[in-house]
């Protein structure tokens, strides 16, 4: 169970990473990425950043992951300057599947309603 500090640091990282992606990263592969959640370990050494992408194409998702992996160092450096933490957490980017799962559920409900 995450305590208050973990959640607070996660919220700050989410806000700052969104800002960094919008203003500092000029890589076209990361355009249109939205940070949906950040989970921080108890010792604040790792932060798993979940993101969603507007495109459902596998090639676009792979390019976005490559762009984020390439920009990881710059994002971590910027976070270190913006946050007052003893050590900046290591960043791990993972695609958030919940958005696509929600779309799938909506589609199933729509099909059920059409069948009636």
Curated annotation (Swiss-Prot):
Q: Where in the cell is it found?
A: Cytoplasm
Family designation: Belongs to the RbfA family.
Gene Ontology CC terms, in alphabetical order? cytosol
Q: What role is this protein assigned?
A: One of several proteins that assist in the late maturation steps of the functional core of the 30S ribosomal subunit. Associates with free 30S ribosomal subunits (but not with 30S subunits that are part of 70S ribosomes or polysomes). Required for efficient processing of 16S rRNA. May interact with the 5'-terminal helix region of 16S rRNA.
Please name the gene that encodes this protein: rbfA
For this UniProt record, the keywords arranged alphabetically read as follows:
Cytoplasm, Ribosome biogenesis
Q: Which organism is it from?
A: Enterococcus faecalis (strain ATCC 700802 / V583)
Q: Which GO terms describe its biological process?
A: maturation of SSU-rRNA
The cross-references to InterPro entries, in alphabetical order and at most eight, read: KH_dom-like_a/b (IPR015946), RbfA (IPR000238), RbfA_dom_sf (IPR023799), Ribosome-bd_factorA_CS (IPR020053)
Keyword Iron present in the record's keywords: the answer is: no
- One short Pfam name that applies is RBFA
Return the PANTHER family for the record: RIBOSOME-BINDING FACTOR A, CHLOROPLASTIC-RELATED
The protein in question is named Ribosome-binding factor A
Main subcellular localisation: cytoplasm
């Amino acid at each position: 169970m995450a305590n208050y500090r973990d959640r607070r640091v996660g919220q700050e990282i989410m806000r700052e990473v969104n800002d960094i992606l919008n203003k500092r990263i000029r890589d076209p592969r990361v355009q249109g990425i939205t940070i949906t959640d950040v989970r921080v370990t108890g010792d604040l050494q790792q932060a798993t950043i979940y993101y969603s992408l507007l495109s459902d194409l596998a090639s676009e998702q792979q390019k976005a992951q490559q762009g984020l992996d390439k920009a990881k160092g710059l994002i971590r450096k910027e976070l270190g300057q913006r946050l007052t933490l003893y050590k900046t957490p290591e960043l791990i980017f993972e695609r958030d599947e919940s958005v696509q799962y929600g779309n799938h559920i909506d589609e199933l409900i729509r099909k059920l309603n059409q069948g009636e």
